[in-house]
Amino acid sequence: MGKEDEKESGRDKMKSFGSIRSIFMHADGVDWILMALGLIGAVGDGFITPVVVFIFNTLLNNLGTSSSNNKTFMQTISKNVVALLYVACGSWVICFLEGYCWTRTGERQAARMREKYLRAVLRQDVGYFDLHVTSTSDVITSISSDSLVIQDFLSEKLPNFLMNASAFVASYIVSFILMWRLTIVGFPFIILLLVPGLMYGRALVSISRKIHEQYNEAGSIAEQAISSVRTVYAFGSENKMIGKFSTALRGSVKLGLRQGLAKGITIGSNGVTHAIWAFLTWYGSRLVMNHGSKGGTVFVVISCITYGGVSLGQSLSNLKYFSEAFVAWERILEVIKRVPDIDSNKKEGQILERMKGEVEFNHVKFTYLSRPETTIFDDLCLKIPAGKTVALVGGSGSGKSTVISLLQRFYDPIAGEILIDGVSIDKLQVNWLRSQMGLVSQEPVLFATSITENILFGKEDASLDEVVEAAKASNAHTFISQFPLGYKTQVGERGVQMSGGQKQRIAIARAIIKSPKILLLDEATSALDSESERVVQESLDNASIGRTTIVIAHRLSTIRNADVICVIHNGQIVETGSHEELLKRIDGQYTSLVSLQQMENEESNVNINVSVTKDQVMSLSKDFKYSQHNSIGSTSSSIVTNVSDLIPNDNQPLVPSFTRLMVMNRPEWKHALYGCLSAALVGVLQPVSAYSAGSVISVFFLTSHDQIKEKTRIYVLLFVGLAIFSFLVNISQHYGFAYMGEYLTKRIREQMLSKILTFEVNWFDIDDNSSGAICSRLAKDANVVRSMVGDRMSLLVQTISAVIIACIIGLVIAWRLAIVMISVQPLIVVCFYTQRVLLKSLSEKASKAQDESSKLAAEAVSNIRTITAFSSQERIIKLLKKVQEGPRRESVHRSWLAGIVLGTSRSLITCTSALNFWYGGRLIADGKIVSKAFFEIFLIFVTTGRVIADAGTMTTDLARGLDAVGSVFAVLDRCTTIEPKNPDGYVAEKIKGQITFLNVDFAYPTRPDVVIFENFSIEIDEGKSTAIVGTSGSGKSTIIGLIERFYDPLKGTVKIDGRDIRSYHLRSLRKYISLVSQEPMLFAGTIRENIMYGGTSDKIDESEIIEAAKAANAHDFITSLSNGYDTNCGDKGVQLSGGQKQRIAIARAVLKNPSVLLLDEATSALDSKSERVVQDALERVMVGRTSIMIAHRLSTIQNCDMIVVLGKGKIVESGTHSSLLEKGPTGTYFSLAGIQRTLC
């Protein structure tokens, strides 16, 4: 109950966070100064127009009196022109402050916020991520889309709001000064303008939150698909993923339409300003007739009140951005403010002066928060003496890895305590505690950076010599040195550029470099080949000397030298003792496990006594090292020249095509039609209302009261009609464009993901195309396009319509004045266009930084356990700062440019008003136009100029939108080098499984200097089982990659059933091929859903799923879970143990009933008992199928029809298990078998 109460109180606190001040919590002293100056600029910007209108007051009254003569009239003109020019100069300074200060502080605060957010995410305990299965996509969204929303709010939307709000206030100040009676009467009408905006803001918060939840669900699906793209491709699950993605997006479309309707009602309600003008015109006429008020002053006051109302409407339209910023900020602040139960930032806690390393679990009870109904430990008691090696063995899912997690304080026990040197670990400083431990996990986690940087995660201040020594100790130095870039070689996202054994050795080096007091080895050698395992095991044995070591292993041969071996069963220690002591217990569980593994090894010997001397072992090791080095050195020159052909040029300039975007919107043409028509009619409203307002002024100077009453009645009815018309067309406009934007966004997201899932695997190997960066583009680009189509396009149509109508009316009324006024408008347009072009050129690096930040954040969350174990949070933050260094410098230039362009634009508007004012006065003085025509045209073009200026404020959004359009079509137009849906491809009704590699040359496109195969040939008979063995990194897994056609060879061909694999329809071919990878990739969903990914049809019976699970020895543990097959696997299967994940992956492969079965270390993560049963199941499944098995453990491949030993990128020898052993000590396979026997 306590935790629930805490959660509730936490929610209550969160409600108070969404205040305007909380958004500025990342501002420092400089930012507050910038915001203060920016506030002055924004408020001053709002005062400019009311001040200009105030200047008009004298002119209008002079124009309305018959006593005005040419001399006094021109003096008045000159006086006002000079005043306007002063205002123009002042407006440049004010608007420069507004543009520079807000842009600068927005980018500064956003960068600081991203850092604090990522720091807060990395601060959370592991249990937080267990409960948030979409945590990776959450972080990608917040670090990219949410931070961008807040940055836009600070840089542009907030100053716009302040400017409009101050314009509203300034207008009423001027009005009150000039005519307080009319102002007081008009003031209560503010309520009519406030209520719709406030209601819209409240509704939008709720809708925005729901839209984010829908997007987040869809983003999680996309992130899973992209990060596990090999699994998706192998099982032909592209359409399933796209279908789930599309379904998740449907809810957001409906919510988006509700949002558009709400916006239309709100903006339409602002048409009440026309009704207000109607009333004030009527009341003003009464003041003129009954109180002798001056007509010009009445008109100026009404204009100010109306302008103030329009400005208020503009500011209320910005409530959308306030709401979006608050919603985005709540999501970010929720994480920033969350203090985890196990806080790595907490500096309090005891630090032991001299740590011995004695570990004790005292009556520990534990369950995972994500599975509270499943008890892992009920009363665990375990004592590990200092400096001793203790091995934990037991069935998969028995809780072995949980011991390590508890010791590192990933979690805290529900009851009991864990002691180190007699001190409870919850009393020790968390970071110091973890710094005393070195962890090598079952599934090695590497970061998308260089090998050196990955090893330095273990010890930040280590020297290069220490890095090399650690690599040597883990047997990694040799293969690292063979790379052209050596230790600077990039490992790729999730270490994809390295083989499993290479990744594991780098991970071991990372653990060794910190010289820990306690060494934690969770299946540390499971991915290594026999020769590497022997050397690494010796290294680990040496590293264990003098320090407490906890070893988890399924292969009992690796733990026989442990001081103490503990057998865990059902969360209890059932047996304890040394290897020899436990073997004395004939009926003991450990004895049965050893017997089971010995049976496998004895069978592998087939009654042949294998005896290998240490010299032969070392000789073999040297031969393999030499052969690898030799093959690389001798073949690189002949192949490198061809690799570039396989690397597509994705650096083509992005060419946005708005026409193509509209073609994509073709299905919504009806909504587009009435949306555009409505927007055009909204545009007509502006010049028509301005024309009417200009005409009203002449009414106030009429001498006949009857005429004043009659004409006032006409204009009042006209304004009321405009109010009703505005309400209706705004609803139609915003709903129509919302419909267009939402469905276009959904279509873009679907098509982008669909297209991305056709790209060759190598595209995903490139650093810029990490899952984080791609998901960021999916979220950000589509959102920007929606904003451009839904909001900006409607404003563009509106503006064009207003300009056309204004020009027509102006030319009809007074063509001379109209031509001058029209000719100066392009200056404003050019100024804003310059802003767009220059800001676009400077925004590219900032956009790249966003992608880099998203990529880094996604990788950090995906590997949170490794980061937590090594206390590497600060290292990740340093990497984040590094990727933002360049964009931070560019932001300074962007800020200066924003200030200069905005200041110039605003001052130009005032200067053009001065010019129009002067020239119009000259025409009146010369008798070429009447004053009424001047008022009409002047107001039409002043208000139209404001419309153009408002449209100009969207140039940044348009620039960003066009960039996003270019980015979208860059993805949609990209031609993959391996087309999975080639319509001309051969669709086989059945595959026999005859596989041929003929003279194949291959090197990975991202590492063209490292040759894997040269002139490689192999024949794999249909229906037969073939095992591939060899040293780690020798190309075993590459064979599977080529068969799955993840890659194409540089030369030669890969054939299936005698047909070049490139001639097949790839997706149909993959239906007949099943893959079980070395590192099983599961998706967030239930166990049932994960197994069903192996189905080739949409309808799969429950009995088929259960049979597949039974074949993989998964059924029993699944049914033992409280939710059975409906148990949620968590993000990437985090809720399951390694063995459980592997068995589900095997069940998924079995369900496919393939013709070709590919097993890449399929049983490496299983304990002995499970491995035996699963191995039997696999052997049954392999019967009658072409099976290719990659294994380091030779006992698992002894029954294969053919065993192939790789070396030098060629086949060293091949044959059956017995025939290869008959070659004796001269045979490579014989030597490998001997090495494994010496390890047993």
UniProtKB/Swiss-Prot annotation:
Key words, A-Z: ATP-binding, Glycoprotein, Membrane, Nucleotide-binding, Repeat, Transmembrane, Transmembrane helix, Transport
Topology within the bilayer: Multi-pass membrane protein
Annotated positions binding ATP 2: G1030, T1031, S1032, G1033, S1034, G1035, K1036, S1037
Alphabetical list of SMART domains matching this protein: AAA
This protein's GO CC annotations: membrane; plasmodesma
InterPro entries with a match to the protein in the record: AAA+_ATPase (IPR003593), ABC1_TM_dom (IPR011527), ABC1_TM_sf (IPR036640), ABC_transporter-like_ATP-bd (IPR003439), ABC_transporter-like_CS (IPR017871), P-loop_NTPase (IPR027417)
Transmembrane segments: 36-56, 81-101, 158-180, 184-206, 264-284, 296-316, 681-701, 714-734, 793-815, 817-839, 896-919, 923-943
Compartment(s): Membrane
Residue span(s) of domain ABC transporter: 359-595, 995-1233
UniProt cross-references to Pfam families, sorted A to Z: ABC_membrane, ABC_tran
Binding site for ATP 1: G394, G395, S396, G397, S398, G399, K400, S401
ABC transmembrane type-1 domain span: 35-324, 672-960
Glycan attachment positions: N70, N542, N609, N642, N769, N1015
GO molecular function: ABC-type transporter activity; ATP binding; ATP hydrolysis activity
Family note: Belongs to the ABC transporter superfamily. ABCB family. Multidrug resistance exporter (TC 3.A.1.201) subfamily.
Protein name: ABC transporter B family member 17
High-level lineage: Eukaryota, Viridiplantae, Streptophyta, Embryophyta, Tracheophyta
